[in-house]
């Protein structure tokens, strides 16, 4: 069952760049909630809440219970626009969720057991092909993350979709059967010891 994260927001009446700038001058982040065949809802957020979610990670697959003037809407945070210089959030897009309507969402992958992997202990290199996977999911069962155990991987072993934990309620959108998530590659040639140099030849006798 999806865990909802509560977010308090305030309504704002006007759309447009000028209204958004005014919201920022008031110390808030302008945002919009769209989808579920309803009119978009214009809201403003405390920037500290947005930064908190960014720092937590996994916000793209987290379901939020956005409360505006006492009414709440389940929604996904689809995009956070950042200022090009300060990297502060300047706008947020939410997608309102409708019960029973599946959505596409990026779910992050958490890697564990790297320090116990026989292949990595022998000098192998972990190559992560995908840090996230896009899946189709019911809003009531969106996983916040998938987990994969690397502790048994040797050199040339790999991790695939079927090896991930927590995928039972979702379907990957990538149309490749059991695609690769990560591999343990052999050490590169640059890391192998160089052969000892041959001794210099003795000078010829005159």
Curated annotation (Swiss-Prot):
Entry keyword Iron: no
GO MF terms, alphabetically ordered: 5S rRNA binding; structural constituent of ribosome
This protein's UniProt keywords: Ribonucleoprotein, Ribosomal protein, RNA-binding, rRNA-binding
Region (Disordered): 1-23
GO process annotations (BP): translation
Cellular component aspect of the GO annotation: cytosolic large ribosomal subunit
One Pfam assignment: Ribosomal_TL5_C
Similarity remark: Belongs to the bacterial ribosomal protein bL25 family. CTC subfamily.
Name recorded for this polypeptide: Large ribosomal subunit protein bL25
Organism field: Gluconacetobacter diazotrophicus (strain ATCC 49037 / DSM 5601 / CCUG 37298 / CIP 103539 / LMG 7603 / PAl5)
């Amino acid at each position: 069952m999806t865990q909802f994260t509560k977010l308090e927001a305030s309504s704002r009446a006007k759309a447009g760049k000028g209204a958004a700038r005014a919201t920022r001058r008031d110390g808030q982040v302008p945002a919009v909630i769209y989808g579920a065949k309803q009119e978009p809802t214009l809201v403003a957020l405390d920037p500290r809440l947005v930064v908190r979610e960014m720092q937590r990670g996994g916000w793209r697959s987290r379901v939020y219970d956005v409360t505006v003037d006492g009414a709440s809407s389940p929604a996904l945070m689809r995009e956070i626009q950042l200022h090009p210089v300060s990297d502060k959030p300047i706008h947020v897009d939410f997608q309102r969720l409708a019960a029973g309507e599946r959505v596409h969402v990026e779910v992050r992958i958490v890697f564990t057991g790297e320090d116990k992997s026989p292949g990595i202990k022998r000098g192998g290199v972990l190559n992560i092909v995908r840090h996230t996977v896009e899946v189709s999911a019911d809003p009531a069962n969106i996983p916040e993350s998938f987990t994969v155990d690397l502790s048994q991987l040797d050199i040339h072993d790999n991790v695939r979709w079927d090896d991930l934990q927590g995928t039972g309620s979702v379907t990957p959108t990538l149309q490749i059967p059991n695609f690769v998530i990560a591999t343990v590659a052999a050490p590169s040639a640059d890391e192998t010891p160089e052969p000892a140099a041959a001794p210099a030849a003795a000078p010829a006798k005159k």
